[in-house]
Amino acid sequence: MDKKKHDSHQHEKKADASQEKVEVAQPLSDADRIKELEEALAAKGLESAANWDKYLRERADLENYRKRVQKEKEEILKYGKEEVIMEILPALDNLERAIDHANEESAIVEGVRLTLSMLLSALKKFGVTPVETPQGTPFNPEFHQAMGQVESADQEPNTIVAVFQKGYLLNERLLRPAMVTVAVKPAA
């Protein structure tokens, strides 16, 4: 009987040990599990909100980049020819001077006029227009560069007396100012 008692006692110990193991392996209570899941969900919600915010910022940055590239592309198309035009303007000036200093009408002078007209027409197609500077126009430092001053009783002070060199605009932006002489009041 001792053996039975001993075996029974051993069996109880094993049962107690297995119960302990079961207690250790038992899942958390439902309330604890819910709390744990809510915390995990809240953390994932914050992470999701941060990722969404990051996505929106990146998308806005990309859109701004696209707009900037498009604007730069338009600027290049609009003003990219500025360097070439600046090289052509002195030749244009020389053609105008040749016509102004011609002593007589000849086929050569007429050819120069025709060449000048064609060149001006071609430049106009690319957005180049002359700065209007008729005599008597008020001096505007945005479009004119004063090369000198002349005392004049006939003209209002600060008006254009003469144009040395025409100014030009490229798509309404100043390419080269007109070089002019400006009237001042005569000394008393």
Swiss-Prot record:
For this UniProt entry, what's an example GO CC term? Answer: cytosol
Taxonomic source organism? Citrifermentans bemidjiense (strain ATCC BAA-1014 / DSM 16622 / JCM 12645 / Bem) (Geobacter bemidjiensis)
Q: Where are the transmembrane segments?
A: none
Q: What is its main location?
A: cytoplasm
One GO BP annotation here?
A: protein folding
Q: Where is this region: Disordered?
A: 1-29
Q: Any idea what this protein is called?
A: Protein GrpE
- Fill in the subunit field for this protein: Homodimer.
Q: Which domain of life is it from?
A: Bacteria
Q: Where is the composition biased (Basic and acidic residues)?
A: 1-23
Gene Ontology molecular functions: adenyl-nucleotide exchange factor activity; protein homodimerization activity; protein-folding chaperone binding; unfolded protein binding
- Name the family: Belongs to the GrpE family.
Q: Where in the cell is it found?
A: Cytoplasm
Q: What does this protein do?
A: Participates actively in the response to hyperosmotic and heat shock by preventing the aggregation of stress-denatured proteins, in association with DnaK and GrpE. It is the nucleotide exchange factor for DnaK and may function as a thermosensor. Unfolded proteins bind initially to DnaJ; upon interaction with the DnaJ-bound protein, DnaK hydrolyzes its bound ATP, resulting in the formation of a stable complex. GrpE releases ADP from DnaK; ATP binding to DnaK triggers the release of the substrate protein, thus completing the reaction cycle.
The UniProt keywords, alphabetically, are: Chaperone, Cytoplasm, Stress response
Checking Pfam families in the record gives: GrpE
- CDD domains from the xrefs? GrpE
NCBIfam families recorded: PRK14140.1 (NF010738), PRK14150.1 (NF010748), PRK14158.1 (NF010755)
Q: Which SUPFAM superfamilies match?
A: Coiled-coil domain of nucleotide exchange factor GrpE, Head domain of nucleotide exchange factor GrpE
Please name the PROSITE patterns in this protein's record: GRPE
